[in-house]
């Protein structure tokens, strides 16, 4: 059994989804922070659990050719990224391997298409930054401490400039966070502890950054806050932005769920609609539809009837406006719990939260008996659990398509098609 502060020389066998190296010491698993496959390292044990331990690198004795110097001064502290110490190939291979091993672990036979990663920097069209002592940043790993930084390679340059400007202008106020979205314009929303007048800030902001098309504000004293629970007040503009994706225009309000990586999202949506293959006269359900993205794309490309269901009322209001703006009439949208949907359907798209489908949702799918289920997931583990829960009635009929939707982080998305067993 290894002990804290003991030093070992090890060879790294693989890299896990969190960007850490994996090795064994006398058959005991050790995760080594920021180590790469094939590297020979001197390590120090930092934490010991019953079945595994964590270690830090003391020295790299043999370095991987795929190692890169992180282009971020706060990488070792910030909890945002996991793969800045490697090239993008290592990350893509690791994420592809993680998805494959998850299906294998769950004893689901599948084939896999090569992971899709069209862009790996400056892709984030949405950020929530937290205020520290003098500036904004992301949370430190495993804590709520703020790691301040002026630049982030995942963000648009304008986000970095606006966050620095905001930190300077609102210093001394009750500022606690800054929420920004980029689409046809930029939405900026400072979040405070107390009600705050930002008229002067708003005027200077829009003068210096003409791309800012709308400014909102919110305040809350809650220790942990979620955007969907905040009450937003529009200070300038109309309170929303528009994004064009897959040929359609979508309204995005502050609470709207919308993928942060447009380039990759478009490729995922195109594949999902291809697998859905909506036919004339069919009834299609887009469950967990959010602002209606995939359902409206499907409706715009077919003569099927599409039902969009989402539990968040504000998202359905946006979805209805999106349908109207894109002149899509073969769609019905309703704010409700997806597990209570009861209309006859031929096929459906499901894009559940990270925890996967509830038992009620699984029961609903088995009761509705759609011929095809296109499943989009941000969590391979829960995707596999749900596939197994449906396996008495449905079989995997497509390869597993994997998307690096959040490059440099530990997250990955997948999409599959399940077909009803005759």
Regions found by a protein language model. Give the residues of each.
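Extended interfacial segments that mediate partner engagement and assembly in macromolecular machines
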Residues: 58-70, 77-175
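Rossmann-like S-adenosyl-L-methionine
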Residues: 2-9, 14-17, 196-422
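Terminal RNA-binding accessory module
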Residues: 1-70, 74, 334, 338
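Nucleotide donor/acceptor-binding cores
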Residues: 125, 186, 281-282
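Internal alpha/beta scaffold segment
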Residues: 146-177, 181-186, 193-216
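Short, acidic/hydrophobic/Gly-rich beta-strand patch recurrent on exposed beta strands
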Residues: 21-26, 137-141, 319
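Short, solvent-exposed loop/turn elements at beta->coil junctions and helix N-caps
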Residues: 113-120, 178-180, 400-405
């Amino acid at each position: 059994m290894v002990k804290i502060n003991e030093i070992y020389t090890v060879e790294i066998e693989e890299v896990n989804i969190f960007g850490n190296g994996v090795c064994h010491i006398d058959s005991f698993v050790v995760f080594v922070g920021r180590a790469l496959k094939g590297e020979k390292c001197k390590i120090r044990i930092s934490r010991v659990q019953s079945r595994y331990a964590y270690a830090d690198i003391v020295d790299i004795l043999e370095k991987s050719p795929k190692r890169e110097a992180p282009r971020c001064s706060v990488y070792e502290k910030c909890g945002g990224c996991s793969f800045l110490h490697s090239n993008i190939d290592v990350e893509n291979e690791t994420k592809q391997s993680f998805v494959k091993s998850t299906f294998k672990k769950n004893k689901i036979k599948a084939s896999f298409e090569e992971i899709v990663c069209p862009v790996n920097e400056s892709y984030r069209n949405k950020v929530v930054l937290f205020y520290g002592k003098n500036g904004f940043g992301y949370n430190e790993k495993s804590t709520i401490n703020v790691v301040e930084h002026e630049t982030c390679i995942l963000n648009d340059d304008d986000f970095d400039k606006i966050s620095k400007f905001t930190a300077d202008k609102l210093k001394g106020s009750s500022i606690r966070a800054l929420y920004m979205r980029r689409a046809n314009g930029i939405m900026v929303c400072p979040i405070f502890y107390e009600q705050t007048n930002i008229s002067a800030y708003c005027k200077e902001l829009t003068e210096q950054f003409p791309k800012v098309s709308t400014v909102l504000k919110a305040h809350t004293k809650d220790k942990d806050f979620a955007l969907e629970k905040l009450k937003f007040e529009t200070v300038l503009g109309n309170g929303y932005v528009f994004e064009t994706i897959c040929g359609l225009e979508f309204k995005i309000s502050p609470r709207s769920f919308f993928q942060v990586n447009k380039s990759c999202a478009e490729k995922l949506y195109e594949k999902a609609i291809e697998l859905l293959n909506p036919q004339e006269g069919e009834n299609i359900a887009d469950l967990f539809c959010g602002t209606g993205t995939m359902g409206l794309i499907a409706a715009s490309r077919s003569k099927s009837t599409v039902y969009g269901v989402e539990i968040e009322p504000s998202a359905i209001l946006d979805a209805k406006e999106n349908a109207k703006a894109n002149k899509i009439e073969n769609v019905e949208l309703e704010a409700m719990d997806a597990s209570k949907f009861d209309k006859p359907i031929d096929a459906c798209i499901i894009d559940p939260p990270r925890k996967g489908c509830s038992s009620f949702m699984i029961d609903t799918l088995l009761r509705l008996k759609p011929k095809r289920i296109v499943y989009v997931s941000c969590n391979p583990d829960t995707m596999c659990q749900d596939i197994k829960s449906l396996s008495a009635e449905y079989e995997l009929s497509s390869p597993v398509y994997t998307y690096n939707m959040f490059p440099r982080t530990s997250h990955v998305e997948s999409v599959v098609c399940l077909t009803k067993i005759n």
